């Protein structure tokens, strides 16, 4: 996969898989990278680490909620303005709300079912919004192509965007 000189967005970038992927994209010489996470402190630390090593502002930190559409649009707008059209997106943000689907209260003997709102939140972050971050990239590539006068995609153009 060609990474050099492409612009990337990584959600969940402050830790774990997102952080490791962001560092690898930078090692592979991504042109610019948007780092996205709820945890602002570790996110800024990572951006500072990347930018210091690169000697330029390669990494742009964005602290916010990946399920917020306005936030997603702002990340893509600012990243595109600073580095160009995003061609790689890594929707690595995820949350874990572990518990049994049904628990029996030891004292009362009553069943407690996993809260629907918590389940919805997990689905929103882990399943639904990664698709929206990918579609945002695809839409912006399509607009960029149209603005450059390109119509149909041709196989010899190779890959236009990558979702990891």
Write out the residue ranges for each language-model feature.
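Conserved glycine-rich Rossmann-like NAD(P)H-binding loop of the short-chain dehydrogenase/reductase
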Residues: 29-45
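The beta1-alpha1 cofactor-binding region of Rossmann-like NAD(H)/NADP(H)-dependent oxidoreductases
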Residues: 40-41, 63-74, 116
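Canonical Rossmann dinucleotide-binding motif of NAD(H)/NADP(H)-dependent dehydrogenases/reductases
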Residues: 2-34
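Catalytic Tyr-X3-Lys loop
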Residues: 95, 108-134
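Amphipathic alpha-helical dimer-interface segment in Rossmann-like NAD(P)H-dependent oxidoreductases
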Residues: 124-157
